[in-house]
Every structure is written in C-alpha cells, then in structure tokens.
Regions:
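Portal/gating segments that form or line small-molecule/metal binding sites
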Residues: 1-143, 153-213
C-alpha cells in the first residue's frame, strides 16, 4: 500500500484544531475552527475524491480518540461519514489498550517499523489524517508517498505547527494544485527522496534573451 498524508494547515503552518474551537484545546490553544469559514463545494468534492482512494486510516492516538468521539455521532448524511466510520482504522500507540471505533487495529511498538510492515501489504492507500507528529515521523523515515495539503487563507499566530522538527529533509514534486473561490489551496505532492540543495548562481541561463531585450 501507499501512504498518503492529508493535512489542513494555515498560511503560517498551524495544523491544530481546524474544525472547531473545542476540537483540540491542548496547550491552551483557543483559536480552533480556522478552516470552517472557507469550506466550500470544491473543497468537499476534492476531499471526498481523496477519501475514495483509502483502504484504511492511519492515526496517532490523540487524533484517533477525537475522531472516535465525534464521527460516530454525526447523523446527517454527507460524503464522508459512512466511509470514515466503516474504513479500517490503524492507531499507532503504545498507550491505548484497544480501540472503541470499529474496525480498529492497535499498532504497538516502533511506529516506523509497524507502519512499514503494514505498508508492505497489498492495497491502495493508507491515509494519515491529522496526526501531525505521526505524519512527520513517517515522512522523515521515507514511508510517505503522497502529501496532500489544504492551506487555509488565515494566519493564526499560535498552535502546533505541521512538521515542526523533521529529522530528515524531503524533496517534493507538485502533482496538482487548485484554488477554491473561498481561497483554499488544494495541493498534492509526491515525495522524491532527499530535498535537493544548490548554490544560487544567478538566473541568466533561465531568461530568454529575446524576451529580456
């Protein structure tokens, strides 16, 4: 299977609490709900298409517990609820004895090793939703194939950042991009190994001399 990370993030890199003021108040965070004003039909269609690619959800404990609390309580039909509730869930944790949001498998031990073993099985995508710390660890370990970001037109100024302390550099190739009418950026990247580096040597070779004249 391939591993895909799906993250909502502000322009200043905050990934905490996109859905509501009470979604994640850890560390005193009070500015949740920053994604909601920008949700529109184009975003819903794209996010639904992404979820259609999943054969399982790969979650950290904190995100798993929040999802297990909230998703089963959603009664009205929408493009996500049934799939979120019925997809296999894999929660990476050494502190949770068992899962309450079925079907759930608890992956104990070293996160990189357990996810690598799961990734080796046949299937389409294992999708990391939220779970920024888990996503960063997997990205650094070279286990992530695809990174999908929804960038909200907001600067929050506080909260947990996405990929704050990755231990390895990662190169990305842009595969698709779109902007919604409300200002959301929908970005999809594929990983390309270590991020390339170079020394700046001017742009002369990149400029068409006829246009420059």
């Amino acid at each position: 299977m391939r591993v895909a990370i799906i993250e909502f993030v502000t322009l200043d890199g905050v990934s905490q609490g996109p859905g509501s003021a009470t979604e994640d108040t850890s560390d005193g965070f009070t500015r949740g709900g920053w994604l909601v004003p920008s949700i529109d039909e184009q975003f819903v269609r794209r996010a639904s298409d992404w979820l259609d690619l999943a054969d399982g959800l790969l979650l950290g404990r904190r995100t798993y517990e929040a999802f297990a609390r909230d998703w089963p309580q959603i009664a009205e039909p929408d493009p996500f609820t049934e799939r979120m509730n019925t997809l296999p869930k894999y929660v990476v944790t050494n502190t949770l004895a068992e899962g309450s949001w079925n079907p759930t498998t608890v992956l104990r031990g070293d996160p990189v090793e357990t996810v690598a073993a799961l990734k080796s099985q046949p299937g389409r995508e294992l999708q990391v939703h939220g779970s920024a710390r888990l996503g960063a660890a997997l990205l650094s370990a070279g286990l992530v194939d695809t990174l999908r970001l929804v960038v909200a037109p907001a600067v929050i100024g506080s909260g947990r950042r996405l990929f704050t302390h990755p231990s390895e550099s990662v190169g990305l190739r842009l595969r698709s991009h779109a902007a919604t009418a409300t200002g959301l950026l929908l970005l999809e990247y594929e990983t390309t190994g270590v991020a390339p580096l170079a020394d700046y040597a001017g742009v002369t070779e990149l400029v068409d001399p006829d246009r420059a004249a």
